[in-house]
């Protein structure tokens, strides 16, 4: 059996959106003749503690862990945060933050930790893996980012050993939605772009999760790019199935950063409640996961405070129950320059439940390629008020069958084809 080294920052019991792609694929790869070896930090900053994910780690997979030094505790102490507080991505703050300390810490983090706060792990990892791979050779390496420091490890190994290397971009690097907020100096911006270009040009293959982003990566210099979307694992669906809510629940799963806010939607929903008291009596807006304070405030300002339910951060297993029990699932595409290619991993889990999915974002974007059939709908922000009756009809729409194109089994076959062609 061939061997592939997968270098990933996220691995169980660490939860969050970054862990699922290669956790699920590594479970399936041995069935196609590829034995994964996982290289991951021993002591990472936890996004979410979710030990339930360990059930997806195959007992026959070797997991190599090495210590990592990160600056997050210094950052937390300097800004007055608790050392137990999770560091959010995408400028999400559940409570109001402010002051010069926050601004200065962001400036330091953005300009001195390039490409990201895991940069101190690059050199020791390259040194360790060069020795490890001489004793335990592999046929290919896959690095997955963000954090893009994982790609810098792959670049170092490629240059030192000439091993076949796939760089997997779950999110863009310099085209990430919050890049403009990083307060970069010209020198730091140039360094980001130089390192990104080196990775894109020197990797044997670049993978990404959406079609628009593939085009963007080609423009940035990638010599060979393939799209392998995220997917769903039918084994994650609750057993027995979660009953569908009696009320009209509109449920968003996952983090809600400021760029995902949709004031037009909150106003359209309030209008529906005002126009139809029977609908209002049954309507609930449920946020499952961390929510930026500006969004919660915006929902209340729109007059939907009495309809809002929040659960906070929960495990993946609990999140799947909320998905399956929702009347309608809500996907909010970030209102940012790279919005056309945003295709979140949770979208495919949404589809697996058979529940209607309301996508709020560009109709011409990649989300529409997945939500291309009823009972799903994609509506851009300016059109939400005008199409509010269409939204209301979704709460009584029949369920659908999940499309097998988006299963993890299908995406794993694509990964195997890519590995075999290296």
Show which residues each predicted segment covers.
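Membrane-proximal helix-turn-helix segments that form the acceptor-binding/catalytic region
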Residues: 130, 149-152, 156-160, 173-174, ...
């Amino acid at each position: 059996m061939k061997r592939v080294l997968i270098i990933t920052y996220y691995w169980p019991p660490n939860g969050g959106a970054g862990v699922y792609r290669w956790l699920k694929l590594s479970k399936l790869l041995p069935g196609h003749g590829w034995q994964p070896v996982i290289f991951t930090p021993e002591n990472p900053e936890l996004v979410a503690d979710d030990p339930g994910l360990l059930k997806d780690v195959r007992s026959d997979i070797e997991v190599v862990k090495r210590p990592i030094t990160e600056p997050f505790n210094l950052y937390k102490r300097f800004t007055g945060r608790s050392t137990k507080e999770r560091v959010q991505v995408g400028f999400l703050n559940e409570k109001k933050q402010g002051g010069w300390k926050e601004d200065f810490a962001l400036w330091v983090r953005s300009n001195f930790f390039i490409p990201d706060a895991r940069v101190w792990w690059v050199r020791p990892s390259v040194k360790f893996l060069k020795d490890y791979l001489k004793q335990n050779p592999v046929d290919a390496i896959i690095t997955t980012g963000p954090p893009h420091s994982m790609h810098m490890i792959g670049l170092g190994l490629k240059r030192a050993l000439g091993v076949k290397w796939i760089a997997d971009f779950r999110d863009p690097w310099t085209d990430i939605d919050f890049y403009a907020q990083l307060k970069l100096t010209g020198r730091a911006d140039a360094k980001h772009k130089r390192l990104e270009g080196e990775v894109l040009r020197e990797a044997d293959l670049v993978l990404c999760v959406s079609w628009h982003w593939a085009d963007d990566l080609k423009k940035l210099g990638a010599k060979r790019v393939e799209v392998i979307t995220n997917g769903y694992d039918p084994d994650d669906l609750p057993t027995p199935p979660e009953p569908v809510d009696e009320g009209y629940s509109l449920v968003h799963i996952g983090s809600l950063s400021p760029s995902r806010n949709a004031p037009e939607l909150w106003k359209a929903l309030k209008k529906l409640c005002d126009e139809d008291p029977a609908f209002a009596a049954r309507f609930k807006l449920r946020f499952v996961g961390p929510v930026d304070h500006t969004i919660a405030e915006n929902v209340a300002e729109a007059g939907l405070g009495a309809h809002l339910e929040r659960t906070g951060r929960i495990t993946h297993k609990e999140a799947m129950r909320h998905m399956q029990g929702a009347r309608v699932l809500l996907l909010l595409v970030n209102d940012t320059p790279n919005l056309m290619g945003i295709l979140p991993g949770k979208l495919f889990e949404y589809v697996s439940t058979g529940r209607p999915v309301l996508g709020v974002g560009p109709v011409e974007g990649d989300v529409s390629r997945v939500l291309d059939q009823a009972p799903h709908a994609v509506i851009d922000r300016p059109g939400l008020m005008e199409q509010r009756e269409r939204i209301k009809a979704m709460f009584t729409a029949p369920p659908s069958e999940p499309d097998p194109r988006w299963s993890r089994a299908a995406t794993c076959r694509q990964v195997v084809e890519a590995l075999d062609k290296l």
